[in-house]
C-alpha cells in the first residue's frame, strides 16, 4: 500500500479505520454501511442467466483431427476494451492463424482471465455437500484434532467422494491446480492419501494436484506417525512431506525436523510445513527450517505455510529474513486470515520470495466457512489488505493466479502465445471489478478444452 502523506491529519489510519470511526459517530445505519464490504456481491456475482442471444455458443471442430484447435472469439483478456480472438492449438495459446475448420466458441465479449492456483487446501477434511455439521468448542490444535477425528467417523460419505466433490467444485470455480494437505496419523492410517490420490486421478483432465502428507496430530507426540509418513513417501503416493509447529505443538524442534527433512532427503520429495507459531518461537523454528534447507541443498523444494511470525516484523528484520528465504529458495503461503496475519506479499516478492494463496480448510471441523473458490479468496486477500486502488485489486488476483503457479512450478497462464490455454470466462467491465463482484464463472477452460460451465463440471 502507498504510504499516506505525513501532512494529513489522519496519517497512520487506514480507510477501514476511518470508516469504523465514522460508523461509531453516525450510529447503527452508518455501521451497517461500513460493514457492507464483506457482504455477498449484489451485481455481477448474482446476475441472472444470460438470454439465449447472449449465451456463449460453440461450433464443432472440422479439422479432421489433425490438430486440436479452437478459436475463442470475442474475448477480452484481463478486461481489455476491445474483444479479440484467442486461438488455441493442442492446449496452448497460439499466435498463428487457426487451422481451417477449427472449433469456434463465440464468447460474446466475456472477460478472459487465467485460472487460479490453490496453494494450500485440506480437501480430505471437508464436509462440503454433506448435511450441516454442528461444531463443538475448541481452542487448541490438540482439541481441533480431536474434533477432526469425530467428524471423520460421523460423515457417512467416503473421504474419496467428499474430496473429489470439493476438488471438482474448485475446478468449476476456476482452479487449475492445488496443493492438497492430507492428514496422516494413526487415527486415519493412509486413507486420506489414498482418497485424495483417487480424486486426483479422476480429475486429472482438469486439475493438477500436489499431495502433502500432513502430520496434523504431530510427528513426535503421536507414535506411529513418522512410520506412516515414511510409507507414504516410499510408495510414491505423495509429492511432499509436511510438518507442524515443531516447538509449540510437537515440542521437539530438532527431532521433528530430523524426521521431516530426513524423509524428504531419502525419497526425493518436497517439504511443506505448517507454522502457526508466533514471535520468537516462530522465528526459531523458521530459522531452523532455513538451516536444514541449506544443509540438504533442498533449495526450491521447501514451503512454509501460514508463517504467523512474519507479519508485524520490523522492516529491517523482515528484509533480512526475506533475503535469507530467497537465498534458500523457500516459498511461503498465506490464506489471508486477517489483516494482522496475512503475509507482506509485496515486500517478500521484492526480495524474490514466492508467495502462494490458498483456501485452507473448507467446511470442516475447524470452521463452517470456506468454498474452495480462489477468485473469492483473492477477494478476501484484497479485503484484509484494505485494497482500494485498481492496481491493489489486480495484485490480489495475481497472488491467486501467478503466485500459486510459480510456487507449484507451473507456467503462468497469462493468455500469451506459448502459454497453457487455462482460463475462465466471466461478465464484467474490468479485472478490478471482477475481484470485487465475483461474477459467475460462465466457462472454465483447461488446455483448450471446456471443463466447466456455469459452475458445473462438464464431460465428467
State where each predicted segment sits.
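N-terminal metal-binding scaffold of metallo-dependent hydrolase/deaminase domains
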Residues: 1-101, 431
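His/Asp/Glu-enriched, well-ordered alpha-helical/loop segment
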Residues: 292-302, 346-428
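Alpha-helical scaffold segments that flank or form the walls of functional sites
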Residues: 129-181, 187-202, 228-234
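Active-site gating loops and adjacent loop-to-helix segments of metal-dependent hydrolytic enzymes
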Residues: 126-159, 240, 267, 285-303, ...
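C-terminal cap of metal-dependent C-N hydrolases
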Residues: 417-460
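Divalent metal-coordination and catalytic microenvironments
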Residues: 75, 91, 109, 120, ...
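Active-site core of metal-dependent hydrolases
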Residues: 206, 212-223, 235-343, 354, ...
Amino acid at each position: 500500500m502507498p504510504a499516506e502523506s505525513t501532512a494529513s491529519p489522519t496519517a497512520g489510519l487506514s480507510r477501514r479505520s476511518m470508516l469504523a470511526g465514522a460508523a461509531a459517530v453516525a450510529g447503527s445505519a452508518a455501521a451497517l454501511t461500513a460493514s457492507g464490504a464483506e457482504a455477498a456481491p449484489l451485481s455481477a456475482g448474482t446476475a441472472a442467466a444470460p438470454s439465449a442471444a447472449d449465451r456463449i455458443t460453440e461450433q464443432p471442430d472440422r479439422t479432421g483431427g489433425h490438430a486440436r484447435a479452437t478459436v475463442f472469439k470475442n474475448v477480452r483478456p484481463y478486461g481489455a476494451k476491445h474483444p479479440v480472438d484467442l486461438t488455441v492449438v493442442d492446449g496452448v495459446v497460439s499466435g498463428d492463424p487457426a487451422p481451417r475448420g477449427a472449433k469456434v466458441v463465440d464468447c460474446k465479449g466475456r472477460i478472459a482471465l487465467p485460472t487460479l492456483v490453490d496453494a494450500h487446501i485440506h480437501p480430505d477434511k471437508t464436509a462440503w455437500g454433506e448435511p450441516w455439521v454442528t461444531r463443538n468448542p475448541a481452542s487448541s490444535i490438540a482439541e481441533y484434532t480431536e474434533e477432526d477425528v469425530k467428524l471423520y467417523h460421523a460423515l457417512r460419505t467416503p473421504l474419496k467422494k467428499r474430496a473429489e466433490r470439493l476438488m471438482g467444485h474448485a475446478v468449476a470455480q476456476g482452479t487449475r491446480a492445488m496443493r492438497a494437505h492430507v492428514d496422516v496419523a494413526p487415527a486415519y492410517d493412509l486413507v486420506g492419501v489414498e482418497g485424495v490420490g483417487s480424486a486426483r486421478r479422476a480429475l486429472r483432465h482438469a486439475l493438477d494436484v500436489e499431495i502433502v502428507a500432513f502430520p496434523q496430530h504431530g510427528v513426535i507426540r503421536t507414535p506411529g506417525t513418522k512410520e506412516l509418513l515414511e510409507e507414504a513417501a516410499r510408495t510414491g503416493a505423495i509429492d511432499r512431506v509436511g510438518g507442524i509447529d515443531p516447538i509449540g505443538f510437537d515440542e521437539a524442534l530438532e527431532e521433528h525436523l530430523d524426521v521431516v527433512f530426513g524423509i524428504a532427503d531419502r525419497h526425493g520429495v518436497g517439504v511443506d510445513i505448517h507454522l502457526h507459531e508466533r514471535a520468537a518461537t516462530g522465528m526459531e523454528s523458521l530459522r531452523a527450517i532455513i538451516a536444514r534447507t541449506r544443509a540438504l541443498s533442498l533449495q526450491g523444494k521447501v514451503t512454509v505455510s501460514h508463517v504467523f511470525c512474519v507479519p508485524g516484523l520490523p522492516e529491517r528484520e523482515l528484509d533480512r529474513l526475506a533475503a535469507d528465504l530467497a537465498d534458500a529458495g523457500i516459498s511461503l503461503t498465506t490464506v489471508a486470515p486477517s489483516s494482522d496475519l496475512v503475509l507482506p506479499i509485496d515486500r517478500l516478492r521484492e526480495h524474490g520470495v514466492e508467495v502462494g494463496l490458498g483456501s485452507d480448510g473448507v467446511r470442516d471441523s475447524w470452521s463452517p466457512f470456506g468454498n474452495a473458490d480462489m477468485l473469492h479468496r483473492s477477494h478476501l486477500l484484497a479485503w484484509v489488505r484494505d485494497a482500494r486502488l485498481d492496481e491493489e485489486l489486480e495484485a490480489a488476483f495475481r497472488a491467486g493466479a501467478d503466485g500459486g503457479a510459480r510456487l507449484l512450478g507451473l507456467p503462468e497462464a497469462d493468455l500469451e502465445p506459448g502459454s497453457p490455454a487455462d482460463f475462465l470466462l466471466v461478465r464484467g467491465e474490468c479485472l478490478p471489478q471482477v475481484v470485487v463482484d465475483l461474477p459467475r464463472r460462465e466457462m472454465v477452460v483447461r488446455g483448450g478444452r471446456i471443463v466447466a460451465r456455469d459452475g458445473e463440471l462438464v464431460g465428467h
